[in-house]
From Swiss-Prot:
Tissue: Selectively expressed by cultured astrocytes but not endothelial cells, microglia or neurons.
A GO MF label: ATP-dependent protein folding chaperone
Top-level taxon in the UniProt lineage: Eukaryota
Main location: endoplasmic reticulum
Phylogenetic placement of the source organism: Eukaryota, Metazoa, Chordata, Craniata, Vertebrata
Signal peptide start-end: 1-32
Induction cue: By oxygen deprivation.
Protein name listed in UniProt: Hypoxia up-regulated protein 1
Functional description taken from the UniProt entry: Has a pivotal role in cytoprotective cellular mechanisms triggered by oxygen deprivation. Promotes HSPA5/BiP-mediated ATP nucleotide exchange and thereby activates the unfolded protein response (UPR) pathway in the presence of endoplasmic reticulum stress. May play a role as a molecular chaperone and participate in protein folding.
Gene Ontology cellular component terms for the protein in this record: endoplasmic reticulum; endoplasmic reticulum chaperone complex; endoplasmic reticulum lumen; mitochondrion; smooth endoplasmic reticulum
Glycan attachment positions: N155, N222, N515, N596, N830, N862, N869, N922, N931
Amino acid sequence: MAATVRRQRPRRLLCWALVAVLLADLLALSDTLAVMSVDLGSESMKVAIVKPGVPMEIVLNKESRRKTPVTVTLKENERFLGDSAAGMAIKNPKATLRYFQHLLGKQADNPHVALYRSRFPEHELNVDPQRQTVRFQISPQLQFSPEEVLGMVLNYSRSLAEDFAEQPIKDAVITVPAFFNQAERRAVLQAARMAGLKVLQLINDNTATALSYGVFRRKDINSTAQNIMFYDMGSGSTVCTIVTYQTVKTKEAGTQPQLQIRGVGFDRTLGGLEMELRLREHLAKLFNEQRKGQKAKDVRENPRAMAKLLREANRLKTVLSANADHMAQIEGLMDDVDFKAKVTRVEFEELCADLFDRVPGPVQQALQSAEMSLDQIEQVILVGGPTRVPKVQEVLLKPVGKEELGKNINADEAAAMGAVYQAAALSKAFKVKPFVVRDAVIYPILVEFTREVEEEPGLRSLKHNKRVLFSRMGPYPQRKVITFNRYSHDFNFHINYGDLGFLGPEDLRVFGSQNLTTVKLKGVGESFKKYPDYESKGIKAHFNLDESGVLSLDRVESVFETLVEDSPEEESTLTKLGNTISSLFGGGTSSDAKENGTDAVQEEEESPAEGSKDEPAEQGELKEEAEAPMEDTSQPPPSEPKGDAAREGETPDEKESGDKSEAQKPNEKGQAGPEGVPPAPEEEKKQKPARKQKMVEEIGVELAVLDLPDLPEDELAHSVQKLEDLTLRDLEKQEREKAANSLEAFIFETQDKLYQPEYQEVSTEEQREEISGKLSATSTWLEDEGFGATTVMLKDKLAELRKLCQGLFFRVEERRKWPERLSALDNLLNHSSIFLKGARLIPEMDQIFTDVEMTTLEKVINDTWTWKNATLAEQAKLPATEKPVLLSKDIEAKMMALDREVQYLLNKAKFTKPRPRPKDKNGTRTEPPLNASAGDQEEKVIPPTGQTEEAKAILEPDKEGLGTEAADSEPLELGGPGAESEQAEQTAGQKRPLKNDEL
């Protein structure tokens, strides 16, 4: 028995340890439940979070604004982000980086890079020799890639979200323009990795806007399709999207609302920035004309002046949207010369006339890609700040054919709210109402490969083949499997973009390389040698276009198949018994279970193998070209049966005949016969058919990225370390600034306090002069040498000053606390004395307190009175400039000791049951006669009437003034049910008038 107990103890300890670990994991998980979204615009970003108790909230930045500039200022020893960096754009435009997202995923010879150079000539861009991309050259020792700069912005957005949520956040959904190609999307993902963010999804900003619109109007969505057009003009680009809303049936959640992207059109350079650049150029021209006769320099050659003009152009664009004209003015634009000029809305519209002509373009592209007409569009909704320009709305009304444009959506925050809803849906920590999102592929992707064919006997040639992998406007996320049937040796194939004819010539040049990846397969021939007796079912390449729209090749496999016959095996007694019992209840052994003993692999493929074995080679080859042997593994076909009839490789005819034979021979499944008798084992063995066995061999893959090489892992790690060092430096800078501000604030506050009466009363002139001199010396040091002081030095200076002023502050603080503490002590002493007096008046037969308890309380009361009077007398003798002997902490200690004794007696009275009353012979309680003498009732009668009422006031709570809970919570009153007080009254032998609630 003892040994058993000893064995159980370690198990119990292990169980408790596991429970503790699980609880710790749950607590840690609860601290990281929040998710965030980043609506990454060209000019500014919006950040939103979802955390337990906070559903979908826009994050306020440090300046309490709902949107933050996407701006970074980089210097040798400091870095600024957000609004701080936007303010530095005027002082140091060369080190202030903006609109750098336009350079993501683009090589140095891209037209978009040349456009960026012309817009912002103050930035120096050099070429990365390995990737042929551009980098910002801040100084000879300082350079950053666009991905690194974006990583800084994403890290800053996470810090804002964490400060707002008050907990760490790692999971995020980031919006990207719908026209981003594979290289641009991978660049954003690399930037997120540098920032340490786990990207749940890259969601297109038009899809996020459509999701936000649908989530808040899900009650209006029904089975009837509603086509909505969203026209989103941002700072850098314009996107027009046609979305269809309707309810659909899902396997997991039943009928749910769905949005489907039907058509997309875009213009990469049409936006508010281009309008501001036109205005900036106009203002620069006006300024040069005003100084034409002064032989001044061209304002365009001054980066700081051009930065001021761009900021004023941004303000002008906003003001002219609501006013017919406005006065542009800048103080000290250049060479201390002020600039002032009047600009009208008509002039602004003339400057941007060619831009307004491009407004209908995305609408036509969206309609063409959706294969819809304007009559099918129910509503056109405006999104984005530049759509507030009146001319944009005027020009847009004509091509959309509507009387008015919809403005019933938050144009600035819709994408952020839709993205954070998707983040909550993708996170395992939240359960949201399902909303099906079907995004669309903008750029088609295909597979190209070359194969030898024999056109004539003895004449062989190479034939180029193309297979569309993901078609234009096809839904994603989606998985596809393509099968190569005519290869038995290693070969290569290429993944490229499909037909991009819908793009204009300029867009094609900006698009970049149309070749994505070259795939080299290794090990195909070895797989055929490994399974010489198996029939090849082709080389299957598994592709995945994930939720972020990023294409990946999951794996490549060589698949073989053969027919095998299971040898009859003698069943054990238990197996026979189990089969017999299951057959009696209509069950049987599943053929799936019989096949589990092999290495067969079940595939999720939609299309059967191409051609049968009886087909001639030419016919099978033609069929391969026509049918494009592609298999979608995202969902099985609805007609595909489950169970044995769904074995891979069967043709529809084989499945039908198989079902028929099984229907005619039910005993093959182990089912009971007509009379309920299970079949004989020998008969079952004879009727057992041959089954197909599939073998899968993994094929080696070597990828060569052609559009834009990804960062090597070592360079990526170097970039991560570079950003971490910058973040650490920023934290150290913030800590130093905090220490300097604390020191400066302490100096000013203390200098002011030295002249306040309450501080002068408790200090001598010499003490104040000493403190004042030290404060002045430290202030001078802070002004002269404080800029180069470290955080430790600043903290040491502050600690030195606090130590010097500690006695002064202590005396003032104690005198502030005395009135409140002494008043509380007096109240507690008075209540305790009254309580003790009432307790002593309780009759002996009803007494619940012992003499020791009451004596102890009386001693504590007397000691406290004595200590208080003595300490006050001693304190009165001391001068105010000396350390006081009456301390607030001592008063609190005395109060705690006295309150502890009173609470002990109160709790005892509350939980003590009343003693039973003695009964006479008639069964009634004995009560003393009303006219009994005082000598007969000396020990039982409560003396004078006034004391009796006082005791009742202490022992019985006021029913009118306090409820039961209030009486119980009062530390100086008994909160019992009142039985003791009633019994004391009966023992007293005095008749009292009954109260209303006792009648």
